[in-house]
């Protein structure tokens, strides 16, 4: 029977050691809570970091970019500019479309922003054109955020107009109702309509004008209230045949009488069922299709939203005819799931490697089982807390848990090693557990809180990066806290019940061989340490040189923002000459599609031509290239992009810009490339002067590639210069001229056909098949005040001019965006510096301001705060350690280990060819928390030896280094192996995880080698400094 130690031993662990059943059940409760939490947690690619973003779209068919800017965009912008919480407002006014994107502060709820936007639209309504076909429509979606799912709807038996009608009424509306869906857009522009194509010669011969026809149609098709009759006994509702709903009915419409004979619409026009906008088209691979893009609301869970869509699709497709086929072309969640699965596999691999290293050191199965239980328990228990904090299972939280594997095992190792040491000395297991746990308790607390102190600055990081790493930091901190609890409760209890002198002494051939190897290593370390202690100044110079080297490496290492991920989807923009027509652009798009689909890595392609609010002009096309799964293709996305661009370069007259889609989207506009730089001025003239000059210089920089600008000011314009005096003499107003032109060439929506399920438009235009180009203007006729018909050419001259194809604003001022990529042999930091240097050489006028946008702006912000972030982490750790040790000196000794970690991490990143990006910086901050553990374990035991055994500082630190060498080596290798799977990851999302692993492995290797020697020397140096300081104070007191 064991004699129980005094109740004073064991510290906080005593209660749990003495009550094994209660401790076991408590741990089971943590385990069950974690399992339940894991099942309840949503899955996503990254933590929720979206800015509240709302897009406002206004369509005004036929309006020029200048008219859209002045008549639609500007009135709306003035109202939006008064909203509180607005961070940035950008707009794009192109032919027939105005798109305004409103980005709000992160702290503003999206519902509040929505209310403000609706109020602003209402306030601007009276200032908008009276003939606007539809009011502005807003959606809670970021236009730069790629769709979560893309579907193609095709049919071999039905026209596309019928297909779109069915998709819009039966499919799109239902998907829009799913929680998390922000916007469902149909690309292809085949909305059904009745198209009236006037024969200009026929109406001229009859003395009619297009305005006569328009008035007749609008008056003949109405759908308004007619009232009801209320008699003594019956009530009767009034109805009439006031609506015409088919092309045949419109053909029979009488528009005028001449000589008593009716003139019907079919006599002067071709009336047919067609598409509302004939200048829109979409293709799935090579087949014309209706392409449905589903975008999520900011803040919505992408996985659950996509799952809901897939669950509904079978039901929706059953409601369509069998000749209509619905195909899922892309689903972003496929790669997100694969990335999360790969990270989970790496987490399990890290746990296995850590357990293996424990067995290698302890060489005892019972002693290995204890941390083998503590590690997964600490990690699983973290899931329960994540649920309460509304976190998700994503790449960053799983990376935090993977890294935590090496952290949480440290506590268990330290406890087991200390208890085992007393058992090997002959103590009973229970007494050894109480004594060892009590002795090591303060060390565990020091390790835990000093490590959490490193994470505190991450929680105070501002803007998007702070939001991004909030879940990472808190998840890691929670895992570390749970680990500390488990190490002070379950671990000593299990040691007391599972360890014994017999089990620890039981050895096999492997145990004996490894024991001899460790003894030789420790002996060699002891001899080396003795020599180092005899030459302290040489060692100190090595420590100082690592500090200098870390600063130099920090300055010269290439810097980036966020790793470019391979998500299997490429966004593309196809650019043709500015005067390209829709037909010409559609032909070029088909040529490019043929080339792209021949690439072995491409699975499918969707493409779109036309102006719809997202695509700004007819001379550009949007592409989405869906690649095969990563395990089915030989190359990653960047190589595929380079290969596709080389192939498309052979197609004449087009430029192709490609970029891989990313899980982290900071931009608010669809861009041609990954990075953006803007020039903002007070006038378009200033931009037209300086944009070409800057573009010329930027295109010569080797640090940039794919440099392009959205400044397109060579769009052809037929300027109708009206002789106002002549027009006035004939009684013709400018409104009459505009109406005539709009009727002829604007695809004017002149009337609405109402049905039980939907509403369709009547479109008026001239039939220009026989009079293409500018010749069509010669067919325009106007009505004079005396009823005569006047040719437009008699009162106006037609001049050809150039004008912008689109007008862009940023915070209500004209802006041009320059897009660029960064070549493989340069970093984003190099590109940013090169652009800034080039800008200085131009001496831009004061009325032109420049700014980086999107992730480039976030990179500048993150780079500026990085140094302060690291300083804050060091200061936070110093404060915590100073409080724990009640000393100003010992924390400095502990923190002296940090430069070695920085040198190792930066060297490893440079050797691996990785940039110092946000992920790598987080790894360096974590290293600050890891490497100081070595110093803490040494200093704790040295101080105890000085205090309890009366040893000299040199003997105490020497003994502490030898006693703690094995747990120091064990914990460092455990942390290293925990990060190793991240460094070696090759699956989906590996680009995101690898920099963290590389930095941590490199930092741990270098710091492990150096701190074992530098820490004791610095400890003794500061001890002498403390003695000298005390003696100086004592002398001053005696003199006083």
Curated annotation (Swiss-Prot):
It comes from the Bacteria. InterPro entries: AcrB_DN_DC_subdom, Acrflvin-R, Multidrug-R_MdtB. The chain crosses the membrane at residues 16-36, 347-367, 369-389, 396-416, 440-460, 472-492, 537-557, 863-883, 888-908, 911-931, 968-988, 998-1018. It is a multi-pass membrane protein. Disulfide bonds: none annotated. Keywords: Cell inner membrane, Cell membrane, Membrane, Transmembrane, Transmembrane helix, Transport. Coiled coil: none annotated. The keyword Transmembrane helix applies. One of its GO terms (molecular function) is xenobiotic transmembrane transporter activity. It is found in: Cell inner membrane. The keyword Cell membrane applies. GO terms for cellular component: plasma membrane. Belongs to the resistance-nodulation-cell division (RND) (TC 2.A.6) family. MdtB subfamily. Part of a tripartite efflux system composed of MdtA, MdtB and MdtC. MdtB forms a heteromultimer with MdtC. NCBIfam families: PRK10503.1, RND_permease_2. This is Multidrug resistance protein MdtB. It comes from Shigella boydii serotype 18 (strain CDC 3083-94 / BS512). The gene is mdtB.
């Amino acid at each position: 029977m064991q004699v129980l130690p005094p109740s004073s031993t064991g510290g906080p662990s005593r209660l749990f050691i003495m009550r094994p059943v209660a401790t076991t059940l408590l741990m089971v409760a943590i385990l069950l809570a974690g399992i339940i939490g894991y099942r309840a947690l949503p899955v996503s690619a990254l933590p929720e970091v979206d800015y509240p973003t709302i897009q406002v779209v206004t369509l005004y068919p036929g309006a020029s970019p200048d008219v859209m800017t002045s008549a639609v965009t500007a009135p709306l912008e003035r109202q939006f500019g008064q909203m509180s919480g607005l961070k940035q407002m950008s707009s794009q006014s192109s032919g027939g479309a105005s798109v305004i994107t409103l980005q709000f502060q992160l702290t503003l709820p999206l519902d509040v922003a929505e209310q403000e936007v609706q109020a602003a639209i209402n306030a601007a309504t009276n200032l908008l054109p009276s003939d606007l076909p539809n009011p502005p429509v807003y959606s809670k979606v970021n236009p730069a955020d790629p769709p979560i799912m893309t579907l193609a709807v095709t049919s071999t038996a039905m026209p596309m107009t019928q297909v779109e009608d069915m998709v819009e009424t039966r499919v799109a509306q239902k998907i829009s109702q799913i929680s998390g869906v922000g916007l469902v857009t149909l690309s292809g522009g085949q909305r059904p309509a009745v198209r009236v194509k006037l024969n200009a010669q026929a109406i001229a011969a009859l003395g009619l004008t297009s305005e006569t026809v328009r008035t007749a149609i609008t008056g003949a098709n109405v759908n308004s209230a007619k009232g009801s009759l209320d008699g003594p006994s019956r009530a009767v509702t009034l109805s009439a045949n006031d609506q015409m709903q088919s092309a045949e009915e419109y053909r029979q419409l009488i528009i005028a009488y001449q000589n008593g004979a009716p003139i019907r619409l079919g006599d002067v026009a071709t009336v047919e069922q067609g598409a509302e906008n004939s200048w829109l088209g979409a293709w799935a691979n090579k087949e014309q299709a209706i392409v449905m893009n589903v975008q999520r609301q900011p803040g919505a869970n992408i996985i659950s939203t996509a799952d809901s869509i897939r669950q509904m699709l079978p039901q929706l497709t059953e409601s369509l005819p069998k000749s209509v086929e619905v195909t899922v072309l892309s689903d972003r969640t496929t790669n997100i799931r694969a990335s999360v699965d790969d990270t989970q596999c790496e987490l399990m691999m890290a746990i296995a490697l850590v357990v293996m290293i424990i067995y290698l050191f302890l060489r005892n199965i019972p002693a290995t089982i204890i941390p083998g239980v503590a590690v997964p328990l600490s990690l699983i228990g973290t899931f329960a807390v994540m649920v309460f904090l509304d976190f998700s299972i994503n790449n960053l939280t799983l990376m935090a848990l993977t890294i935590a594997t090496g952290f949480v095992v440290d506590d268990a190792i330290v406890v087991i090693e200390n208890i085992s040491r007393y058992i090997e000395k002959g103590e009973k297991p229970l007494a050894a557990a109480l004594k060892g746990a009590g002795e090591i308790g303060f060390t565990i607390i020091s390790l835990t809180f000093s490590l959490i102190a490193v994470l505190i600055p991450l929680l105070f990081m501002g803007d998007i990066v702070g939001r991004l790493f909030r879940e990472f930091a808190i998840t890691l901190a929670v895992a570390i806290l749970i680990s500390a609890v488990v190490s002070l409760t379950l671990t000593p209890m299990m040691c007391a019940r599972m360890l014994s002198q017999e089990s620890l002494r039981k050895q096999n051939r492997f145990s004996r061989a490894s024991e001899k190897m460790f003894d030789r290593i420790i002996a060699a370390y002891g001899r080396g340490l003795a020599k180092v202690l005899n030459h302290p100044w040489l060692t100190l110079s090595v420590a100082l040189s690592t500090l200098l080297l870390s600063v130099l490496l920090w300055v010269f290492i290439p810097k980036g923002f966020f790793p470019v991920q391979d998500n299997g989807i490429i966004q593309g923009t196809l650019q043709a000459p500015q005067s390209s027509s829709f037909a010409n652009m559609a032909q070029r798009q088909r040529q490019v599609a043929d080339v792209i689909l021949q690439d072995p890595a491409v699975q499918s392609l969707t493409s779109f031509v036309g102006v719809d609010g997202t695509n700004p002009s007819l001379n550009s096309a949007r592409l989405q290239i869906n690649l095969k799964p990563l395990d089915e293709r030989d190359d990653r996305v960047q190589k595929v992009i380079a290969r596709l661009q080389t192939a498309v370069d052979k197609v004449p007259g087009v430029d192709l810009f490609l970029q891989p889609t990313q899980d982290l989207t900071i931009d608010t506009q669809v861009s041609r490339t990954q990075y953006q730089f803007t020039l903002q001025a007070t006038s378009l003239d200033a931009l037209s002067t300086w944009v070409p000059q800057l573009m010329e210089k930027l295109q010569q920089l080797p640090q940039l590639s794919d440099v392009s600008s959205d400044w397109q000011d060579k769009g052809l314009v037929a300027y109708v210069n009206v002789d106002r005096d002549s027009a006035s003499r004939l009684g013709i107003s400018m409104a009459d001229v505009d109406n005539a032109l709009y009727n002829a060439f604007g695809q004017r929506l002149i009337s609405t056909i109402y049905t039980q399920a939907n509403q369709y438009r009547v479109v008026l235009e001239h039939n220009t098949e026989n009079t293409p180009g500018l010749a069509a203007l010669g067919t325009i006729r106007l009505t004079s005040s005396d009823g005569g018909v006047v040719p437009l050419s008699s009162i106006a001259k037609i001049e050809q001019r150039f004008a912008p194809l689109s007008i862009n604003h940023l915070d209500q001022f004209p802006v041009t965006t320059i897009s660029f990529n960064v070549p493989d042999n340069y970093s984003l930091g190099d590109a940013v510096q090169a652009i800034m240097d080039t800008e200085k050489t131009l001496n831009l006028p004061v009325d032109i301001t420049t700014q980086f946008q999107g992730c480039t702006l976030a990179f500048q912000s993150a780079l500026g705060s990085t140094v302060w972030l690291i300083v804050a982490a060091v200061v936070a750790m110093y404060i915590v350690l100073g409080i724990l040790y009640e000393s100003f000196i010992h924390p400095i000794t502990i923190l002296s280990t940090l430069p070695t970690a920085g040198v190792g991490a930066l060297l490893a990143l440079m050797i691996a060819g990785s940039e110092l990006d946000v992920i790598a910086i987080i790894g360096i901050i974590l290293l600050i928390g890891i490497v100081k553990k070595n110093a803490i374990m040494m200093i704790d035991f040295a101080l105890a030896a000085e205090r309890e055994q009366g040893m000299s500082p040199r003997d105490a630190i020497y003994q502490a280094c030898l006693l703690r060498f094995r747990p120091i080596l064990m914990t460092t290798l455990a942390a290293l192996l925990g990060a190793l799977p991240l460094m070696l990851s090759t699956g989906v999302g590996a680009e995101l995880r690898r920099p963290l692993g590389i930095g941590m492995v490199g930092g741990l290797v270098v710091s492990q080698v150096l701190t074992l020697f530098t820490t004791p020397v610095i400890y003794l140096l500061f001890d002498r400094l403390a003695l000298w300081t005390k003696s100086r104070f004592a002398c001053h007191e005696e003199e006083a």
